[in-house]
Every structure is written in structure tokens, then in C-alpha cells.
Amino acid sequence: MTDRFQQLLASIKPVDMNLTSTVKAHLDDLTKPQGSLGRLEEIVMKYCIATGTTKPSLSKKKVFCFAGDHGVAAEGVSAFPAEVTPQMVYNMLGGGAAINVLSRHAGADLEVVDMGVNHDFAEHPMLRRCKVKHGSANMAEGPAMSIEETLQAIMAGAELAIEARNQGYELLATGEMGIANTTPATALYATLLGLPVEAITGRGTGIDDERLHHKVAVIEKAIEVNRANLATPLEVLAALGGFEIAGICGLILGAASVGMPVVVDGFISSSAAVCAIKLSCTVSDYLFFSHLSNEQGHRAVMQKLGARPILDLDLRLGEGTGAAMAMQVIEASVKIYNEMATFSSAGVSGKND
């Protein structure tokens, strides 16, 4: 497994920045004042560079919602019981969750991935069964996952991305479902980015002040308990992460390895993106951060990464909802690039010198 993982990292190539001048020249020749479409121009520029072409296409999109349970839920860090994770997976499979509505609206296919739910699901056309284990261990008592389990989850995610590329998908989005998963996400941020736990710990599913203080203490305890196992990004992910987070990390790495951009959802998915960036800094050129989460700490994370999310809608649901929304903005930017007339083709006079 380690050899395959190293091969995956080695296969991630830097983007070709030489495309920038050609893409910019085309954008500047469209029938509008230069730069007047603002961030839409930045977004399609990044999309072109990530996909390695000056003639971008975007017709096939997919959202992957990774699900997993967390042993740390036993510490009482969430307002909801752990059994909500499988219940919400069933809701998604039945078409009733927010991500079902928004992925349909975006014209994106949706697949739910069981990475580590503490429940056994029957086969379903929307469900991919990649279960590593029935939930992670309690990270407040020791590592959430072993290195081998973490690598298994990463490689499963990577294989999903590579398969999607082979099926003709051009843009992927991440989502997640897992009760208590803001707790490992916060621990990952604190450890990998050096952010103070108390400043970035949020209310997640809506916990009160007393439980929020308890959540901070649990995260600080988990980091201290696992202090000896935090030497590398992979060890940090294993000790303080979760199966769905590792799966998303793998999806990002796999997509980058085949030159495919990924739209990262909110607070949880961004923690997986941080793990991927720490494992291979090159992947950041393939990432679109979809939205600024309303979850406390996400703004500090985005600032630390130097990232500017596409949307700011006070979202804090997860599931891939923000990513599905942002997919539509990316698609609009590609259509602008491809479908607008140029000054010469439209017979419109350019700017006076």
C-alpha cells in the first residue's frame, strides 16, 4: 500500500503556467472591458491551467459525498447522536437531502461513499461501498486510524477520482457526512496549520457554550495524547482524522494525478484539502475552494492557505452543498470563455488607445 501511495504522489505534476498568456489574451479579446467580469475571469483562468488547455470544456460533473463515523463522538462533542450518520446516508440515497437537490440543480451526478460508517448498507446504485472499518477509534484516547487504514482510505478515494476521469468527468466536488467530524477537522487544522484550537473550534451541529468548551478540551486532549504520532502529515491524518476525511484527501490527490480540478466544500472538506496539500503542495493548483463556511475558524484557514473561496453564503451544512453551488459558477465562467463573441468576430470596436 505504501508503494502505491508514493507512486500516487509522484504522479502529481505541476500545472503549465505558460498557458496563462494565451488564456488572458482570449479573455481580453471578448466583447467587454478587460477584467470587467472580475472573478469569473480568474476562475476560468485557473480552470484552464488546471485542465491544461486553452480550449476548456465542462459538461460532466460529479459530487462525491464521503461518509464515516467517529469514535470521538462518544466524548459528547456533537448535538446529534452517532446514529444520524447512517440515517442521513439513507436520506441521501432516497433523494431527500440538501445535496441531492443542489447536485441535481447543478447538473452533477452524485455518489455517496461509505468510507467508515458504523452500519452495513445493502447495495444501492448511488452508494459506493469502500468501508475501511465501522468508524474510527476515539482520537481522545489514541490514534483515530492506523497508518495502514489511512492509506487504504486515501487510495480508495484516489481510485474513485481516476475512475471518474476515465468515465469522462471533467470536474469533481467533495462532500461529507459524519457526526462529530468538525472535531477531527479542527484538530487537523490546529496541528497542520498551527492555528490555536480555541480560536477555530466552532459549534458544529449547534452545541451550546458548555459543550463548546468541552469540545475544545477534547481536541486539545486528542492532540496531546497523540503527540508522539504527529511527525508527518500522514501520521497527523491517521491520528486526528477520520475515514471520510482521508477518502476526500485521496480523491483530491487522485484527481490531481490525472489533471482534473476539484471543488472543495466547506469546513470538513477543507481539512482534507489541507492534508492533501501537506502531502503534495502541487495539488493546490487543482483546487477551487467553494465557499467560506460559517463554521468558526474557516476564515482563518482560508487566510492561512492564501485561498479565496468562490461563495460566501453563511453555509455550514457540509454534504457538498457549497461545492455543488460553486460548480455552477465555474461552469458559467467556462461558458463565458467559450461562448462570448470577440471584438473581431462581432465587429465591435475595441478600446481607444
Curated annotation (Swiss-Prot):
One Pfam entry for this protein is DBI_PRT
- What is the source species? Chlorobaculum tepidum (strain ATCC 49652 / DSM 12025 / NBRC 103806 / TLS)
Question: What NCBIfam families does UniProt report for this protein, alphabetically?
Answer: cobT_DBIPRT, PRK00105.1
- Job of this protein: Catalyzes the synthesis of alpha-ribazole-5'-phosphate from nicotinate mononucleotide (NAMN) and 5,6-dimethylbenzimidazole (DMB).
* Reaction(s) catalysed (UniProt annotation): 5,6-dimethylbenzimidazole + nicotinate beta-D-ribonucleotide = alpha-ribazole 5'-phosphate + nicotinate + H(+)
The region annotated as signal peptide is: none
Pathway terms, separated by semicolons: Nucleoside biosynthesis; alpha-ribazole biosynthesis; alpha-ribazole from 5,6-dimethylbenzimidazole: step 1/2
**What family does the entry list?**
Belongs to the CobT family.
**The protein's name:** Nicotinate-nucleotide--dimethylbenzimidazole phosphoribosyltransferase
